[in-house]
């Protein structure tokens, strides 16, 4: 079980996972060693699974951010999954979902032409509905 201080630590690390233990401790009113001990405990208990960065895909040349609802009418999804594994340049996440569709695919593309080619290739394995991200 976690307490209010642990919740504050998680909140601060969610905002900036690069905080030093000293700065984090100041924000939650603990010493750096006490803060580090709590962070280690959160990691050991599996509450913190890792620290990550947020990549600016536009600066890397991927100006199109899209979500695709994937619809597969066949029982076997392996051809679709095999195709997705070959598309790691464009696929950010592939979530198996319930509700509308079988999968929710998050992708990035450098141009409409590349998106169009991806959709043509995808259509050999599944039907889809595309939503383009306008803003965050």
UniProtKB/Swiss-Prot annotation:
What does the protein in this record do? Negative regulation of glyA transcription and kinB-dependent sporulation.
State what protein this is by name: HTH-type transcriptional regulator LrpA
Looking at the record, the residues that make up the HTH asnC-type domain are 2-63
Which SMART domains does the UniProt entry name for this protein?
HTH_ASNC (SM00344)
Q: Which GO terms describe its biological process?
A: response to amino acid
Write down the Gene3D superfamilies for this protein, in alphabetical order: 3.30.70.920, Winged helix-like DNA-binding domain superfamily/Winged helix DNA-binding domain (1.10.10.10)
Q: Which PROSITE patterns match?
A: HTH_ASNC_2
DNA-binding region, residue intervals? 21-40
| GO molecular function terms attached to this record | sequence-specific DNA binding
Whether Oxidoreductase counts among this entry's keywords is no
Disulfide bridge partners, by residue number:
none
Q: Which UniProt keywords apply?
A: DNA-binding, Repressor, Transcription, Transcription regulation
Please report the organism this UniProt entry assigns to the protein: Bacillus subtilis (strain 168)
Look up the record and report any one GO term of the cellular component aspect: cytosol
């Amino acid at each position: 079980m976690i307490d209010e201080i642990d919740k504050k630590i998680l909140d601060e690390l969610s905002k900036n996972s690069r905080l030093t233990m000293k700065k984090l401790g100041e924000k939650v009113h603990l010493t750096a060693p006490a803060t580090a001990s709590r962070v280690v405990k959160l990691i050991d208990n599996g509450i913190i699974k890792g620290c990550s960065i947020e990549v600016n895909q536009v600066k890397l040349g991927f100006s199109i951010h899209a979500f695709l609802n994937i619809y597969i009418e066949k029982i076997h999804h392996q051809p679709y999954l095999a195709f997705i594994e070959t598309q790691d340049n464009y696929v950010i996440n592939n979530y198996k979902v319930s509700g509308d569709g079988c999968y929710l695919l998050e992708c990035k593309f450098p141009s409409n032409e590349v998106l169009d080619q991806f959709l043509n290739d995808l259509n050999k394995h599944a039907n889809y509905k595309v939503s383009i991200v306008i803003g965050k």
